[in-house]
């Protein structure tokens, strides 16, 4: 990552090389999704729950490999997949997301 960008990241867990998404970015991201009230949401990379806790629905699930709920083992029906996945495995994340056949994938 460019040092000019890296210093602006407010929260980072260097032990796991995790970057946490700021709440204002999550709110903007979620505001761009056209959803129905009964949609089932999935946050495949829960982290601290910043996406999950701001989903506009109670019909939601999460995955988090650090909590033994690996997204790559997830096979339930879902309408919307939304999160900020690790870029190091982004291609695999997209493949798995498409396999689940949601109506919306938003990363």
Residue ranges and their predicted role:
Residues 56-61:
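Structural alpha-beta junctions
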């Amino acid at each position: 990552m460019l040092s000019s960008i890296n210093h602006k990241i407010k929260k980072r867990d260097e032990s796991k090389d995790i970057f946490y998404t700021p709440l204002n970015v999550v709110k903007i991201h979620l505001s761009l999704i056209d959803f129905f009230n009964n949609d089932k949401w999935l946050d495949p990379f829960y982290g601290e729950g910043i996406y999950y806790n701001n989903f506009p629905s109670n019909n939601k699930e999460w995955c988090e490999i650090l909590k033994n709920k690996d997204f790559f083992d997830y096979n339930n029906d879902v309408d919307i997949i939304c999160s900020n996945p690790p870029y190091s495995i982004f291609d695999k994340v997209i493949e798995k997301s498409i396999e689940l056949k949601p109506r919306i994938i938003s990363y």
